[in-house]
């Protein structure tokens, strides 16, 4: 299974929903990076994703996007293939 990295922030309902969706898809561990605790992490997230909002989700080296993008990927049947290439 690919490594899952998620940039998150505090009190973020979309972050919580993304974690639940990923766990339901069989992801046992998510590398969570809190951008509120580190300006460097926020800058890194922006550089890698081009976005300023959380969550930003990466599966392996692939930038999935935010929760809506992850949900759409799951609904279209592409999440499992990305997690288990």
Swiss-Prot record:
Tell me the GO BP annotations in alphabetical order: cell redox homeostasis
Q: CDD domains, from UniProt? A: GRX_GRXb_1_3_like
Name the cystine pairs: 12-15
Q: Which GO terms describe its molecular function?
A: electron transfer activity
Localization (cell): Cytoplasm
Organism superkingdom: Bacteria
Task: Spell out the family assignment given in the record's similarity comment.
Answer: Belongs to the glutaredoxin family.
Protein name, as recorded: Glutaredoxin
Q: Which organism is it from?
A: Neisseria meningitidis serogroup B (strain ATCC BAA-335 / MC58)
